[in-house]
Amino acid sequence: MAQTETQEKKGLGRKVQAFGSFLSSMIMPNIGAFIAWGFIAAIFIDNGWYPNKELSQLAGPMITYLIPLLIAFSGGRLIHDLRGGIVAATATMGVIVALPDTPMLLGAMIMGPLVGWLMKKVDQFLQPRTPQGFEMLFNNFSAGILAFIMTILGFKLLAPIMQFIMHILSVAVEFLVHLHLLPIVSIIVEPAKILFLNNAINHGVFTPLGTDQAASAGQSILFAIESNPGPGIGILLAYMIFGKGTAKATSYGAGIIHFFGGIHEIYFPYVLMRPLLFIAVILGGMTGVATYQATGFGFKSPASPGSFIVYCLNAPKGEFLHMVLGVFLAALVSFVVAALIMKFTKEPKQDLEAATAKMESTKGKKSSVSSKLTGATTGTGAAGVAANKANGEDQNEASSEDEEEDLLDNYNTEDVDAHDYSNVDHVIFACDAGMGSSAMGASMLRNKFKKAGISDVNVTNTAINQLPNNAQLVITQKTLTDRAIKQVPNAIHISVDNFLNSPRYEELLNNLKKDQDKA
């Protein structure tokens, strides 16, 4: 019974992670639009850095129309590619026009995937039944009719529901703010970050509500709750001073990556090594939120990534010191509590490598920065098992891992010399989101090709679920290769342990030159 309950809890956690990951896939590609809107609002509105009545008119339409439509398009495209995105964006206009005074981000996050899924089902039904020669007619009219129906439904049905939901959430936040209880949110948010459940909270609640508040009040504290780098740097500073061995040695580099790069996951293994440090990050987070609430601080747009540099750039006029104070006090409290815990408690039984593997298992995939903490191959097995669980497989861990290994062996994913590269002119790096680690890997390989004089091979990056059917050569981290194979089974697949440091790149480079010289 206890084992069944544990499995159910793990399954629920995976579902929340998957949900958060999907929300993140809609929001993160559009962060640039949020930042552009934030700059326009911060600089040109009446109380901005350089007020300009003419240019300030851009802010309203951008947050009312542009950003919700971009989110809806991204959500629809995730489900049914370009066609799903276009129909989803069109249908979302119904919700936007029905509630023009409320930035309809939440409505776009619902309407986008929903309409994309409906378009996919309509196409699956119609395509086998479409007479030859009528394909364009059926395709265009089916998309147009579905967009028409869903736009009307969005206007009449979804908009009132969204208005009610936004009202309830806003009242809840206002209640916490009024009673000065907003800092208690950190009790949920800070542990959720380390358990990788934060995306569902951050992108599902804070971003829509924060955007709504920023549009009406000019800024929102909700953008500063989860992204504050203070609690994390406090933990790492404690390790720099009181840590030992590998944890101490790696904490310096981790601190730079976390504080200036905004990659918070780099400090998660340090907390997992000593679970009592959850107390430190919670108290640090609460201190930061309490400071911002007391000073009335907030950002005009999402501070993403959670880097101190981004915080400096996004700080509203006249509130730079408030921003610094919130980060400093959060870091100070986190550091003091962590230092006391490390000084007066026993050394952890698990080392940093074990904690990193635990973090990757919790995340359900290989971390793009974990190699900075451990050896290149650390945690691969644990992450592979977790990835299979996240995909909904109900087999036991051993059999799941064996199946994955068999699939990789069948494709010779670790034997670069086993493939023919004579017809390869396009290499694709693929990761979960298609933005972070794969982009860095692709950039590095492009530089290697340039130095080697290989100019006729294009190197790009994308998300695994957006790999094109005609992909020729796909490079993924080992824990994600099985998903890539299932997505494009006819491509050559190469597994690496770390996108930024793999000996297989040199092997690939030599094989490409050799095979293409023969051709």
UniProtKB/Swiss-Prot annotation:
Compartment annotation: Cell membrane
EC code: 2.7.1.197
Main subcellular localisation:
membrane
Top-level division of the source organism's lineage: Bacteria
Q: What range(s) does the PTS EIIC type-2 domain occupy?
A: 19-351
Q: What's in the GO CC field?
A: plasma membrane
* Extracellular-side positions: 53-56, 164-172, 301-320
Query: Would you kindly state one Gene Ontology biological process term found in this protein's UniProt entry?
Result: phosphoenolpyruvate-dependent sugar phosphotransferase system
Q: Where is the active site?
A: C431
Residue ranges with Low complexity bias? 367-387
The coiled-coil segments of this chain are none
Q: Where are the transmembrane segments?
A: 31-52, 57-77, 142-163, 173-193, 281-300, 321-342
**Phosphocysteine found at:** C431
Query: Which residue stretches belong to region Disordered?
Result: 366-406
Topology with regard to the membrane? Multi-pass membrane protein
User: Where in the sequence does UniProt note compositional bias of the Acidic residues kind?
Assistant: 394-406
Give the enzyme class. Answer: transferase
Keyword annotations of the record: Cell membrane, Kinase, Membrane, Phosphoprotein, Phosphotransferase system, Sugar transport, Transferase, Transmembrane, Transmembrane helix, Transport
Q: Which segments sit on the Cytoplasmic face?
A: 1-30, 78-141, 194-280, 343-519
Q: What does this protein do?
A: The phosphoenolpyruvate-dependent sugar phosphotransferase system (sugar PTS), a major carbohydrate active transport system, catalyzes the phosphorylation of incoming sugar substrates concomitantly with their translocation across the cell membrane. The enzyme II CmtAB PTS system is involved in D-mannitol transport.
Query: What is this protein identified as?
Result: PTS system mannitol-specific EIICB component
Tell me the lineage of the source organism: Bacteria, Bacillati, Bacillota, Bacilli, Bacillales
